[in-house]
Amino acid sequence: MKITRLTTYHAAPRWLFLKVETDEGITGWGEPVIEGRARSVEAAVHELAGYVVGKDPARINDLWQTMYRAGFYRGGAILMSAIAGIDQALWDIKGKALGVPVYELLGGLVRDRMKTYRWVGGDRPGAIIAQINDYRALGFDTFKFNGTEEMKLIDSARAVDAAVVKVAEIRETFGNSIDFGIDFHGRVGAPMAKALLRELEPFKPLFVEEPVLAEQAEYYPRLAASTCIPLAAGERMFSRFEFKNVLCAGGIGMVQPDLSHAGGITECVKIAAMAEAYDVGFAPHCPLGPIALAACLHVDFVSHNAVLQEQSIGIHYNEGADLLDYVINKEDFHCVDGSIAALPKPGLGVEINEDMLKRANENPPDWRNPVWRHADGSIAEW
């Protein structure tokens, strides 16, 4: 079997899909995308096509290493996202060719169902309690929301109190009947992160995500030493080499690589295993589309330290399409009590409605994240 062609499709709300075709008629799908940089990743995918077209798709490890090492310059968000989408499609092809789900190729199941959580609120968190009530009625008991709006490097007691009041209200309303993670989203500098963590501790969040930017990872051990809240990070780390440094330094209780950003299935299986060796949980980042979610689930199902899976149904970014709109076999992704069962179909287990995708590609949105500014006019972290 040989790879014959790579085709990309843009689709609402902010996704890029990749179709990899072979001379035996078996097709694989991937989702290579950086939110807000889809066209940059698309260009990288087609540059990398020269390394894979004409090659045997079953040699996934060799193709991965070739895409990564054949160029003198390597790594980073764009290239690793391009590799990720191609890698996902290669695993999809191999599973379909052998008639088994990808998790069987990775050693088989360690669990039957994977617990997921729902996003509530928005970029500037609001209406959280009402949304939690709606989703609890559907069986969900674990949620995540943004912890702050813009926050200056050194900010006021008022800014801290505004963040804490929201969390206090949620815990007061629901007691211990729900769990929630709080996403700082890299908006908080190290000085304020320490203050916020101290004030949030009484409300027992499940985790705090991106307490500081990945560029400030040296603060993770110091922040962890100041709080009992588990710290999570990883959506803006793109290879096992970046995770190696963080795991060696300590401080993170849960790693969150993105299967569409951090080299795909091949790389993230290694990251999960590295984290397990450090007694660190694995909870892939995935506010993306159905192929990315399927890839995450296959790694979750073979990783003993997988604890939670993000998924984007109803997330505030999904304008114009929701998670399963381009999926034919929606029933396989049905959540029961907040969990998704092992995907039964061969490959990644997601059947894409290509006709619908082609129509979406005719006039897709060119999504960009908001640009925020502080009151003094300086740019703020989004």
From Swiss-Prot:
Pathway: Carbohydrate acid metabolism; D-galactonate degradation; D-glyceraldehyde 3-phosphate and pyruvate from D-galactonate: step 1/3. This is D-galactonate dehydratase. InterPro entries: DgoD-like (IPR034593), Enolase-like_C_sf (IPR036849), Enolase-like_N (IPR029017), Enolase_C-like (IPR029065), Galactonate_deHydtase (IPR023592), Mandel_Rmase/mucon_lact_enz_CS (IPR018110), Mandelate_racemase_C (IPR013342), Mandelate_racemase_N_dom (IPR013341). Belongs to the mandelate racemase/muconate lactonizing enzyme family. GalD subfamily. It catalyses: D-galactonate = 2-dehydro-3-deoxy-D-galactonate + H2O. Its cofactor is Mg(2+). One of its GO terms (molecular function) is hydro-lyase activity. The active site is at 185 (proton donor), 285 (proton acceptor). The record marks 310 as: Transition state stabilizer. It comes from the Bacteria. Reaction proceeds via an anti dehydration. It is an enzyme of class 4 (lyase). Mg(2+) binds at residues 183, 209, 235.
